[in-house]
Each structure stands twice: as structure tokens, then as C-alpha cells.
């Protein structure tokens, strides 16, 4: 025991604690800074004190703010909930709505301590307040999208209605055509009994002037000319009077015909959404070959060299068959300078051979030169191999 006391005294002397103060520890009460040696040593050492936690009450939670109150990690703010909870602790979380919350907040409101401006709860509330304008902007965007959706629905309904009107106008147009045929027959029967003097016709009904004569090279293509219609003939009278009678007798029919024509023209200008959206589900994508890594495989085109015998022979044969199949009238005036195998052009005068035969002989010479050159190239390649 004496050894332990000596060790304690040496330790106290080392830290600078007087022995008289140690003796007073046993006589004092069990609270304060003198109740243990550890507290006394900690008081003597130049240590920075730790920040003390500040307990505060969380305000009333409702259904709107419950999702924005932070994480599920427990903290010192959950102590009052645990102490005052009447139900099982495993059935409740911090973000849930508690029973009798208003009564609890009114009871613990006067006991609320001073808030630390750097506490996590205050920072959490500030972030929630900062998020409010973002939520309002999102609500405005959703409202704008809903308005646009209603506008699109109204447009689709209008398009469907116009399609139905178009079908109805088509059916009515068939009925009007039948009525016109019957009226035309009646007017033709009436016109057979009418006769009009040539002096009573207006001056606007005159024969058109004759067309100018065509040049002699196109005279064979000119259609046969018909004699001009006399202004006093009965045919014009018969054709004009029924039209005037029909316009006088049926003005309402003409107006309805014009209105139906304008409506059908408008319906043709507007595209039909039903036809556009009809084949949306039938779209099929083309299968693309991919490598094991997932990249699409692109087929490389074969680059034919200029001295490849196969390409030379195929080019010569193409020229030959193209020359045989081409029967245009410009074939005689075509020059041979574009061909890479052509010989220098000589004068075409003084030859007894016709022009077509000369062209054929030149083409055969070009083809034979190309074939000979291709065979020589293949022999060179085989000798090198």
C-alpha cells in the first residue's frame, strides 16, 4: 500500500498537483471537478474543451415536410421521441407522423433551449427553405405540360371531326353529281326547243384569233385545224342558255357546291393524324452485326488498284456493251479522248470506210489492248509469286 501511495505522490509532484488538495478530495462531495483524480489532472493540463451537444425539439411534422426532414440516422434530437413514445420503438421512424404531436410540442415548447447556429438541424431547415422555390418551379412546369397535353387532345379531336366531315362531304358530293346529271338532261331537252337570234348575243362571245403558223420542220406535227365557230351558230346558244337557266333556277345549289368545294380543299391541306400514327407500332429496326465488345462492325470496301487485271477487263467489257446498247443521235459526234486506251485522233477525211464502221474498229482495238495488258499483268504477278 505504501508503494502505491509513493507512486501516486510522485505522479502528483510530476504534474504539479499539491498533496493538500489531494487530501481534500476524500472529504468533499462526489460532484464537481474535485471528485476524481482524472478530472483534476484534466483541469491542470492545457487541453481545449470539447463542444457540448445542444438538445432541441424538432417542430411539428406534417405530410408535406415529412419527406424533406433529412436522413434516417438517429441523433440526439431523437431522445425526446424515444422517451415520450407510447408505442413500440421498432414501428416508428424519425420521419414518420407521431401520435398526439400537437400536444407534445405545446408541452415541450417552454423547455426549448437556445439554438446553435451551426447545429445540423438549423442547416437542415435552411436547405429545406432553399428547396421551396425549386419545388414551385417544378409545379409550374407540370402545370404547363398538362396545359399542352389538353391542347394536343383538343387538336386530335378536331382532326378526327374534320375527317368525319370529309367523309360526309364526299358522300354528299356524289348526291350533288347525280342531281347535276339530271338537271343537265332537263336543260338539254329544253335547249332543243329554244332559238336565239345572232344579234342578241353579247359582243364578248367572239371567235379566238388563229394561232401563228409553225415553221416548216414542225408542220408535220401540227394537228388538223378546225374551222372557227361562227358567232351566230345555234350550238353556242344551246350551250349558253341552259347554263344561265340553271344558274337562275338553282342559286342555292351553286352556293352549297362552292362551300363544299372550299371545305374539301381545306381538308386536303390539313394532314390526317390517324394515317400518320397508324404504322407507329410496325416499325422494325435492322439487325447490325456487332463485335464481342458491342461495337458495330463496318464492312470495308475493297479498293481496286488501277493495274488490277480483273478491273481492267471488266472496265473494257462495260465500255463495249455500253457502246452497243447506246443508240442516241449524239453517238457520231462523240470524241475518243476520254478513254485512257485510245490512240491519237487522225483525220477522218479521205477514208472509204463509213463512220460507224470506223468507230467499231476503234472500240475493238481498245478492247484487245485492254485484254492484252490484263494478261501481261497477270503473267507478271504469277512470275513474281
Curated annotation (Swiss-Prot):
BP GO annotations: aerobic respiration; mitochondrial fission; mitochondrion organization
UniProt subcellular location: Mitochondrion
Transmembrane segments: none
Matching Pfam families: Mito_fiss_reg
Function: May play a role in mitochondrial aerobic respiration essentially in the testis. Can also promote mitochondrial fission.
PANTHER family with a match to the protein in the record: MITOCHONDRIAL FISSION REGULATOR 2, PROTEIN OF UNKNOWN FUNCTION DUF729
Protein name per the record: Mitochondrial fission regulator 2
Source organism per UniProt: Homo sapiens (Human)
Amino acid at each position: 500500500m505504501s508503494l502505491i501511495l509513493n507512486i501516486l505522490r510522485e505522479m502528483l509532484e510530476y504534474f504539479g498537483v499539491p498533496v493538500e488538495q489531494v487530501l481534500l478530495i476524500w472529504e468533499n462531495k462526489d460532484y464537481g471537478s474535485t471528485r476524481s483524480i482524472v478530472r483534476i489532472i484534466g483541469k491542470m493540463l492545457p487541453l481545449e474543451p470539447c463542444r457540448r451537444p445542444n438538445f432541441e425539439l424538432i417542430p411539428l411534422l406534417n405530410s408535406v415536410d415529412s419527406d424533406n426532414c433529412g436522413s434516417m440516422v438517429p441523433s440526439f434530437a431523437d431522445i425526446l421521441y424515444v422517451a415520450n413514445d407510447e408505442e413500440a420503438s421498432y414501428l416508428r421512424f424519425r420521419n414518420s407522423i407521431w401520435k398526439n404531436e400537437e400536444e407534445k410540442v405545446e408541452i415541450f415548447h417552454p423547455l426549448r433551449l437556445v439554438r446553435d447556429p451551426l447545429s445540423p438541424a438549423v442547416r437542415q431547415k435552411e436547405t429545406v427553405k432553399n428547396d421551396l422555390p425549386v419545388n414551385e418551379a417544378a409545379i409550374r412546369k407540370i402545370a404547363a405540360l398538362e396545359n399542352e397535353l389538353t391542347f394536343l387532345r383538343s387538336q386530335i379531336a378536331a382532326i378526327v371531326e374534320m375527317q368525319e366531315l370529309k367523309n360526309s362531304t364526299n358522300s354528299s358530293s356524289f348526291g350533288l353529281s347525280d342531281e347535276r346529271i339530271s338537271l343537265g338532261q332537263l336543260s338539254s331537252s329544253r335547249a332543243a326547243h329554244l332559238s336565239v337570234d345572232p344579234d342578241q348575243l353579247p359582243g364578248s362571245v367572239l371567235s379566238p384569233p388563229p394561232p401563228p403558223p409553225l415553221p416548216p420542220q414542225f408542220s408535220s406535227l401540227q394537228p388538223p385545224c378546225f374551222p372557227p365557230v361562227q358567232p351566230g351558230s345555234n350550238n353556242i346558244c344551246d350551250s349558253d342558255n341552259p347554263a344561265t337557266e340553271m344558274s337562275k333556277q338553282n342559286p342555292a345549289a351553286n352556293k352549297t357546291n362552292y362551300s363544299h368545294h372550299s371545305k374539301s380543299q381545306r381538308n386536303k391541306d390539313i394532314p390526317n393524324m390517324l394515317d400518320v400514327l397508324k404504322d407507329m407500332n410496325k416499325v422494325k429496326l435492322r439487325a447490325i452485326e456487332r463485335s464481342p465488345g458491342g461495337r458495330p462492325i463496318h464492312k470495308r470496301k475493297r479498293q481496286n488498284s488501277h493495274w488490277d487485271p480483273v478491273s481492267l477487263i471488266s472496265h473494257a467489257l462495260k465500255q463495249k456493251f455500253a457502246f452497243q446498247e447506246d443508240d442516241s443521235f449524239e453517238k457520231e459526234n462523240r470524241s475518243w479522248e476520254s478513254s485512257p486506251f485510245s490512240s491519237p485522233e487522225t483525220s477522218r477525211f479521205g477514208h472509204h470506210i463509213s463512220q460507224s464502221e470506223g468507230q467499231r474498229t476503234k472500240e475493238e482495238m481498245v478492247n484487245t489492248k485492254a485484254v492484252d495488258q490484263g494478261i501481261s499483268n497477270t503473267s507478271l504477278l504469277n512470275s513474281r509469286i
